[in-house]
A protein has these predicted regions:
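Conserved catalytic motifs of ABC-family nucleotide-binding domains
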Residues: 67
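Conserved ABC ATPase signature
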Residues: 46-50, 54
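Conserved ABC ATPase "signature" region
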Residues: 13, 24-42, 93, 141
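Catalytic Walker B motif of ABC-type/P-loop ATPase nucleotide-binding domains
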Residues: 71-75
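Q-loop/switch helix immediately C-terminal to the Walker
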Residues: 5-17
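Hydrophobic anchor residue at the start of the ABC signature
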Residues: 60
Length: 151
């Protein structure tokens, strides 16, 4: 989520100023995050005016400002257009390639399975099945209870 009363730059600065001391380091990191997440063009825009994809990129950029080892992304592919979905998937792949652990919860099973190493299908509050994406897709119980036969 983002601070709704702040613009894009202020949202990221709010996190950076808590973790970094030097102004030049803060500015350098801010510029890198804006660039890496493709949101330089909206840096002065109020966070409430962002599209779904822009907001999602800002949320992840804010998270990265804290230099985490792991991130939890709650429905990162929800409510965004197909182009933005691909952008977010690429960003998630980039996080993974930079050795940042990523835990995703999302109902967009098809897109999510394309970017994860392992998946857990939860049905009625319990783990129905866990495994690699191809194991999930080919599991008869997962097909019957969650994916449907035409997945």
């Amino acid at each position: 989520s983002v601070f709704r009363g702040l613009n894009v730059e202020e949202n990221i600065l709010a996190i950076l100023q808590k973790s970094l001391q030097k102004d030049d380091e803060i500015k350098k990191t801010l510029e890198k995050l804006l660039s890496d997440f493709g949101i330089e063009h909206v840096r002065n825009s109020p966070s409430l005016s962002l599209s779904g994809g822009e907001r999602r990129r800002l949320e992840i950029a804010r998270c990265m400002a804290a230099k985490p080892n792991f991130v939890l992304l709650d429905e990162p592919l929800a409510g965004i257009d197909p182009i933005a979905i691909q952008d977010i998937k690429n960003l998630i792949q980039s996080l993974k390639s930079n050795n940042i652990g990523v835990l995703i919860t999302d109902h967009n099973v098809k897109s999510t399975l394309e970017i994860v190493d392992r998946a857990y299908i939860i049905f009625e509050g319990k783990v129905l099945f866990e495994g690699k994406p191809d194991e999930i897709v080919n599991n008869k119980n997962v097909q019957a209870f969650y994916l449907g036969q035409n997945f």
